[in-house]
Amino acid sequence: MTISPETLAKSILDGFHSHYRRFQVLTQGARERFLKRDWTAVVSAASERIHYYDHQVGTTAKKVERRVGTELDEGLWLATRQRYQQLLKFHPQAELAETFYNSVFCRVFDRAYFNNDYIFVETVLANHIPVPVENECHSYFPVVDGLEGTLTRVFEDIGLGGEFENFENDIEQLRDKFFERATETDIEAHNLRIDVLKSPFYRNKAAYIVGRVVTENNHYPFIVPVLINSQGKLYVDAFITRSDRMATIFGFARSYFMVETEAPSALVRFLKDLMPHKTLAELYSSVGFHKQGKTEFYREFLHHLRRTDDQLSAAPGVKGMVMTVFTLPSFPYVFKVIKDRLGGTKEFGRQTVIDRYRMVKRHDRVGRMADTLEFVDVALPLKRISADLLDEFKQTIANSISIEGDTLVIHQLFVERRMTPLNLYLEYANDEEVDAAMDDYGRALKEMMAANIFPGDMLLKNFGVTRHKRVVFYDYDEVRYLTDMSFRRLPENDWEVSYAPDDVFPQQLAQFAVPQAKYRNKLLKRHPELIDSAYWCRVQKNIRKGELTDVFPYDADLRFTRRF
């Protein structure tokens, strides 16, 4: 039976609507999980939301296959793409629906057809009628209600749903911090507007209120974290201003927020205004639309290639035994491809590496593990690949590449934000920077432990330093759940030592991970418990009991004083 472009386009769009409804249901549950302090459910929902996209793409792709087969009818699909484009003109999630169409098409057909004739390599939404940013926020005018009255209205409207521990104290502290910031920026409370996004941003054990202060000549971002105590009472924890601090909270090493929105593009435009250095890819990912983040990243990369002429080359640092890593010097990312033969004594294979990278993707990254984007069949112009890198490809990842004319296709790769490897950073750092970096390295280990992550290979080369001087882990091939490991104290006599595959002896960790004594001593001065097996076992025990340690994405000195 012949199918019309109209029917085919609507069938794919129906698949997208099913996905988005499920996405919204999982997101809407964030408030109840927060109020119930059901942190286990928080983790499960975050993982399910990431997984569900691929499930719905697969379901829709099978329906398409049943109707049209896997042999491409060029006329039908050219017309289907055109009709689908028309359906999106007034669609509130148009950019996400474009990406969903691409995912379905690419699941069904050969990569030879992955071009702008059949899919949306480039967006066609330039003429799309965007949902106004104002659709996503409420505006308040302190000249009418006064600052305290305005702040009270913000909390009433946003609907957190719980009772506050000491609401009057929270409002007073917010007011004081607001006036402190107003003095710094020379603004007056009666001469401004406050815009607040309608829905709270939920992540881990906190809800965040996000907004901006708009004056005649400027605007200023702010974010208000709200926590919940052991009795289920809410309290405001801080009033955070400055774009760089907000960027850290929305950082690439953190889990995705859950925030309700009918118009993601409007939400992202609001956030982009507050954090102009963030890319669209980063912002879409940060609010849970990670597939849209991939789409935006790929478009950014293609545009960057057209504007530049530098060559892809090996990434700086010690070469790993599992991944071939390369970069484009003018583009702030690294590309990682699993080697054909894993080096050293690695007792696992390719699929284990893939599974572990995906595990981290779904897990709470607590600001200490870089997000990854996974791509298949990525086409790169051969002329942009240096001769040395091409030779390295042929020697290490020959099974993962193919050359088609003037294009090199990588069949699977992972992308991460480029950072300065910690071992290289330390070589050029001054004493103060070394102290801070080794302290933060220890904090990173502890925070990953608290999130039930054992990094496995803790060598300094597997950690990077961000532009905010934060230490972040990025090498996941040996990652395990902390609760799967057995932490033991070393026997006094060597002959008494016996090893099982999951055994770890913390007394040896510092020496193995940080062989240079000058760095190791600084680490152990700040974090001596890292070589105490009892400490690791205590953390393990707490995790098994469902007790999650608080890890705040902002400095402790920004936190409010609680008054009961």
UniProtKB/Swiss-Prot annotation:
Lineage top rank: taxon: Bacteria
GO cellular component: cytoplasm
Residues binding ATP, per UniProt: A315, P316, G317, V318, K319, G320, M321, K336
A Pfam family that the UniProt record links to this protein: AceK_kinase
Any one Gene Ontology molecular-function term assigned to this protein's record: ATP binding
Active site: D371
EC numbers, comma separated: 2.7.11.5, 3.1.3.-
Reactions that this protein is recorded to catalyse: L-seryl-[isocitrate dehydrogenase] + ATP = O-phospho-L-seryl-[isocitrate dehydrogenase] + ADP + H(+)
UniProt KW Cell membrane keyword: no
Keywords: ATP-binding, Cytoplasm, Glyoxylate bypass, Hydrolase, Kinase, Nucleotide-binding, Protein phosphatase, Serine/threonine-protein kinase, Transferase, Tricarboxylic acid cycle
BP term (GO), one: tricarboxylic acid cycle
Keyword RNA-binding: no
NCBIfam families: PRK02946.1 (NF002804)
HAMAP family: AceK
Function: Bifunctional enzyme which can phosphorylate or dephosphorylate isocitrate dehydrogenase (IDH) on a specific serine residue. This is a regulatory mechanism which enables bacteria to bypass the Krebs cycle via the glyoxylate shunt in response to the source of carbon. When bacteria are grown on glucose, IDH is fully active and unphosphorylated, but when grown on acetate or ethanol, the activity of IDH declines drastically concomitant with its phosphorylation.
Similarity comment text for this entry: Belongs to the AceK family.
Name of the protein in its database record: Isocitrate dehydrogenase kinase/phosphatase
Organism the protein comes from: Idiomarina loihiensis (strain ATCC BAA-735 / DSM 15497 / L2-TR)
Taxonomic lineage of the native organism: Bacteria, Pseudomonadati, Pseudomonadota, Gammaproteobacteria, Alteromonadales
